[in-house]
Amino acid sequence: MRKMLAAVSRVLSGASQKPASRVLVASRNFANDATFEIKKCDLHRLEEGPPVTTVLTREDGLKYYRMMQTVRRMELKADQLYKQKIIRGFCHLCDGQEACCVGLEAGINPTDHLITAYRAHGFTFTRGLSVREILAELTGRKGGCAKGKGGSTHMYAKNFYRGNGIVGAQVPLGAGIALACKYNGKDEVCLTLYGDGAADQGQIFEAYNMAALWKLPCIFICENNRYGMGTSVERAAASTDYYKRGDFIPGLRVDGMDILCVREATRFAAAYCRSGKGPILMELQTYRYHGHSMSDPGVSYRTREEIQEVRSKSDPIMLLKDRMVNSNLASVEELKEIDVEVRKEIEDAAQFATADPEPPLEELGYHIYSSDPPFEVRGANQWIKFKSVS
């Protein structure tokens, strides 16, 4: 009797509250899927665009939520490590733009290709690398995805051709990847990303021309986050309709803060390219919460109130969360459990990224040429011979 009373007392006092919460989540009957209305895309040289309604399954919703939370927390951890001077050099964060990288990946196949600019952490993750590999690369450790030598911009994954530090230079490369897809007869597309700040680069228009001329399966994607470094799009461009910039290339403007809009637009664009019609252009209207880079506080050319308004009204993670909870695809408690798991994953990765050793100096020349004999590289003080290994 005493044991029974003690057990009842523990339940009433809340000692079993956390396990009970898990039982509640596990036993609740959730919907398998739900249909949502999404914003209609603005179109250029297209008679029809992506659908204005879409179905989200519970499984996909939970996956998207976890991925976006992981990207958000990973970027916030990178911010912390940078301020602690553990991450050094250039570092461009993408928090606020999670619906872009996760939504684009949801609309293509793993065998498709992607190349982007220097704001690349989120795409590196969605292309399949772990948080541990990404943070270790940021801190310059051997366990990083590029052996600690690439840093923030130069990360690689399967069918991901890294970021590019030269503004707009990745766009002709993306057209070249699309050319390889067509030349080799593969049913694949290349997503070629650039920002609104790069949209005025001449090489981009040259890539447009060749892609259209050769009908390459290339999706040109402008991530319009409203500011090129510290310059607003209105001050930098005579026309801010970036989806029309291709002129002879069809385009669509997409709500880049809504992962479902991004997913459906990407599926539409990929199907267009796979059909042999040639390239298509997408403009994702999005927003970055951080400044241009870690050296930019981000409040000298925009107000804190503007940033807060976007956070409160258009945050991509909150938008997905509200949809899932209100349509019985998930519960608040279940999503909180995901948040806890993501935070733990990030902390574990950060510990690895700070404890893993840096690559030794003698490995500086590794992974440059695959089969050439050893060569000499001039060091700071003397000539040092490095091995050339794959």
Curated annotation (Swiss-Prot):
Q: Where is the transit peptide?
A: 1-29
Entry GO CC? mitochondrial matrix; pyruvate dehydrogenase complex
Residues that bind Mg(2+), according to the entry? D196, N225, Y227
Q: Which residues carry this modification: Phosphotyrosine?
A: Y301
Q: Which residues bind thiamine diphosphate?
A: Y118, R119, G165, V167, D196, G197, A198, N225, H292
**Which catalytic reaction applies to this protein?**
N(6)-[(R)-lipoyl]-L-lysyl-[protein] + pyruvate + H(+) = N(6)-[(R)-S(8)-acetyldihydrolipoyl]-L-lysyl-[protein] + CO2
Organism's domain of life? Eukaryota
Keyword match Acetylation: yes
Q: Where in the cell is it found?
A: Mitochondrion matrix
**Where does it mainly reside?**
mitochondrion
How is the subunit organization of this protein annotated in UniProt?
Heterotetramer of two PDHA1 and two PDHB subunits. The heterotetramer interacts with DLAT, and is part of the multimeric pyruvate dehydrogenase complex that contains multiple copies of pyruvate dehydrogenase (E1), dihydrolipoamide acetyltransferase (DLAT, E2) and lipoamide dehydrogenase (DLD, E3). These subunits are bound to an inner core composed of about 48 DLAT and 12 PDHX molecules.
What role is this protein assigned? The pyruvate dehydrogenase complex catalyzes the overall conversion of pyruvate to acetyl-CoA and CO(2), and thereby links the glycolytic pathway to the tricarboxylic cycle.
> What protein does this entry describe?
Pyruvate dehydrogenase E1 component subunit alpha, somatic form, mitochondrial
Give the species this sequence originates from: Macaca fascicularis (Crab-eating macaque)
**Gene name, Swiss-Prot/TrEMBL:** PDHA1
